């Protein structure tokens, strides 16, 4: 159950980052204030809940094991950036993502 909490904390953290990115997207000047307030409010909510879940994780998992698992954030953000904003990702970046996943698998298998 705690590993599910860790994944959920990671996903909420990523959601918060993505909301911040969305807040920077161009909108008409008359809608800008509401747009920014909405997305930054959602970002704060996601990041706040992620922090609470992270504290639960740290109560149950050694920080040396738990913290590297947050590297999943790099993977989630890359996938979301491609899907949501059609951002280009170089082969070198994908290679880095593969190394991150490999590192997480290696570290996770020690538990």
Swiss-Prot record:
SUPFAM superfamilies: Multidrug resistance efflux transporter EmrE (SSF103481). The chain crosses the membrane at residues 38-58, 61-81, 88-108. It holds the Pfam family EamA. The keyword Cell inner membrane applies. It comes from the Bacteria. It is found in: Cell inner membrane. Residues 59-60, 109-111 are periplasmic. Its main location: membrane. GO terms for molecular function: carbohydrate derivative transmembrane transporter activity. Residues 40-109 form the EamA domain. GO terms for biological process: lipid A biosynthetic process; lipopolysaccharide biosynthetic process. GO terms for cellular component: plasma membrane. It is a multi-pass membrane protein. HAMAP family: Flippase_ArnE. Translocates 4-amino-4-deoxy-L-arabinose-phosphoundecaprenol (alpha-L-Ara4N-phosphoundecaprenol) from the cytoplasmic to the periplasmic side of the inner membrane. Belongs to the ArnE family. Heterodimer of ArnE and ArnF. This is Probable 4-amino-4-deoxy-L-arabinose-phosphoundecaprenol flippase subunit ArnE. The gene is arnE.
């Amino acid at each position: 159950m705690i590993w599910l909490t860790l994944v959920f904390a990671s996903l909420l953290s990523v959601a918060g980052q993505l909301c911040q990115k969305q807040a920077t997207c161009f909108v008409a000047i008359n809608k800008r204030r509401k747009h920014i307030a909405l997305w930054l409010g959602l970002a704060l909510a996601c990041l706040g809940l992620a922090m609470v879940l992270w504290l639960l994780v740290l109560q149950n998992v050694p920080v040396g094991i738990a913290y590297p698992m947050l590297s999943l954030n790099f993977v989630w953000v890359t996938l979301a950036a491609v899907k949501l904003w059609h951002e280009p990702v170089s082969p070198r970046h994908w290679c880095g993502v593969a190394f991150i996943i490999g590192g997480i698998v290696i570290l996770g298998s020690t538990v």
